[in-house]
Swiss-Prot record:
Taxonomic source organism: Saccharomyces cerevisiae (strain ATCC 204508 / S288c)
One of the Pfam families matching this protein, by short name: Arrestin_N
Function: Regulates expression of PIS1.
Keywords linked to the UniProt accession: Meiosis, Sporulation
Protein name: Sporulation protein 23
Length: 523
């Protein structure tokens, strides 16, 4: 990689010995390379053949939580990336005493990656139920356009009497995950909560999965086996590029049943050179002058619907009734896709054939089903029925005063039903659709979040019970599976904004004169 620097105050002979030009580095992650990384990191539980690992907290490091002083080259430093309080994102390290700074630069456009590869399976869409099995290869993901992350590491040395020796320098894209499962004692009753334990799944007993990356992609600018690079006063840029193919990384997610999290991590190992070292060879062997600088930035990965998906424009209609067909409920929805913060339309029709029936209330809610694998506590095998956490969020109610007892047909049109944004009060437990493969159980999902629209109609009628007339309450529930996403879910299907021409002169068949173009450029 080529880099520029200002004039050096050190001996030119020393500079020639330790300086070299390094070409620009980039790397591409494919499905095969991802699996290779998984085998590399979790192939042996005791991590034989790898460096011993030391657990650290970034917030306790020097220079604003970035620098390990007197770092050991025979140790690999790990931190729990999902504990943001202990390990916050820090993108710059400044050492005023030694006169240098290191910064991680990443444009905002690279901080969120959106793959248009959310394949829902046309025959039986994934969002229809909470089943975790038969998660097949996603063909749509394989066709999606690769995405890139571009950035640079800038090293700046301010002082004439100081210099740095770069012994190693790399940039990594790391994926950290937490997977959970419900361990069930199959010999006892299935309804006994005391025999169900939800635990985190780990690849190794020594470290939590969130401490060591599930997958990572690395660009190495300089390794320990290379010659050391001498940097004197000046500014040095190290650009990097990651190219990500679809179907390699899971999407970002955070809940009490599972997490997936990404970081860009810059790792630079330096040796601080004093202004007048008495013995250069002795100095180079002295590890007390070695520092390791860790810089990190958050990356989000999203899956959105491909441009070929028409789910947003698909309507649905369904009908339900009680056993005696005394109450008939019809529901029409304008879309099978509901975006958080965007209004949608629902039409409710209720018909009663028995005038003695009294309608009490109607409600519309969105139900969430969050499923994780169920594991037999003894055999450790995955069970067919997953553990499902059920929750509901009420959207709209119709009170009893809206039902005239003399009528037999009631119609309600909800034009502005909205699942609010988190800023407007949506609880944090509510999540959008999510389904990603498990690292532990092939062809099964690690976590699946699905949703239903629930219409509930409560009514009462008088009945004879042991010769006495009593009022009994009943309920009819109409539900329909929907896909809930955020504002980006249908980005790929949006058409360019229509701009109306003001007059016919806006439509020009002939190009402008060269003299006019030249005149504009000369201004």
């Amino acid at each position: 990689m080529l880099f520029s620097s200002s004039s050096s105050s050190l001996n030119s002979e020393v500079s020639q010995v330790f300086s070299e030009n390094i070409s620009s580095r980039s790397t591409t992650l494919t499905e095969s390379s991802t699996q290779s990384e998984i085998r590399q990191h979790f192939g042996n539980e005791d991590f034989s053949g790898e460096l011993p690992k030391k657990l650290i907290q970034l917030k306790k490091l020097k220079n604003g939580g970035t620098t390990i002083k007197k770092a050991k080259e025979d140790l690999e430093y790990c931190y729990d990336s999902l504990r943001l309080y202990e390990n916050p994102y820090v993108t710059s390290s400044v050492d005023k005493k030694c006169g240098y700074s290191i910064e991680l630069y990443l444009d905002n456009k690279y901080k969120t990656l959106m793959f248009s590869d959310l394949q829902l399976n046309a025959d039986y869409p994934l969002y229809y139920d909470s089943s975790l099995d038969n998660i097949s290869t996603n063909v749509e993901r394989e066709r999606a356009t690769p995405l890139q992350i571009k950035g640079k590491i800038r090293i700046n040395i301010d002082r004439e009497d100081q210099a740095l020796l770069i012994t190693s320098h790399s940039i990594s894209l790391k994926c950290f995950t937490k997977e959970y499962a419900c361990f069930v004692n199959s010999e006892t009753s299935k309804n006994s909560y005391s025999d169900k334990i939800i635990k985190e799944l780990n690849h190794t007993e020594f470290f939590e999965s969130s401490t060591y990356p599930k997958q990572q992609l690395r660009v190495i600018h300089h390794s320990l086996n290379d010659k050391k690079i001498l940097l004197t006063k000046g500014t040095y840029d190290y650009p990097f590029t990651f190219t990500l193919q679809a179907n390699t990384f899971p999407a970002s997610f955070s809940s009490f049943f599972g997490k997936t999290h990404f970081r860009i991590e810059s790792l630079t190992t330096i040796m601080r050179i004093p202004s007048k070292p008495k013995n250069l060879l002795k100095f180079l062997k002295n590890e007390s002058f070695t520092d390791k600088i860790i810089l990190t930035e958050e990356i989000k990965v999203k899956r959105v619907l491909p441009s070929t998906s028409m789910l947003k424009f698909e309507t649905f209609q369904l009908r339900s009734y009680n056993t005696a067909s005394e109450i008939v409920v019809s529901v029409i929805g304008n879309s099978k896709l509901i975006e958080i913060g965007m209004p949608f339309q629902m039409i409710l029709s209720i018909t009663k054939t028995d005038s003695s029936i009294e309608l009490q209330e109607a409600s519309l809610a969105v139900a969430q089903r969050m499923a994780i694998p169920s594991i037999d506590l003894k055999t450790k095998k995955i069970l067919r029925e997953p553990y499902i956490k059920k929750s509901e969020y009420l959207l709209r109610t119709v009170e009893s005063q809206s039902f005239d007892s003399d009528k037999t047909i009631f119609g309600f049109c909800f034009d502005d039903v909205v699942i609010p944004t988190y800023a407007d009060g949506l609880p944090s437990w509510f999540k959008t659709f999510y389904c990603e493969p498990s690292s532990f159980y092939p062809n099964h999902a690690a976590l699946k979040v699905t949703h239903l629209l629930l219409f509930r109609i409560t009514y009462s009628r008088n009945e004879l019970v042991e010769g006495l007339e009593m009022k009994k309450n009943y309920r009819i529930t109409v539900n329909f599976p929907i896909l809930v996403g955020d504002s980006d879910i249908s980005t790929s299907s949006l058409l360019p904004k229509y701009e109306k021409f003001e007059n016919i002169s806006d439509l020009q068949d002939e190009p402008p004169l060269y003299s006019m173009v030249a005149g504009e450029n000369s201004l």
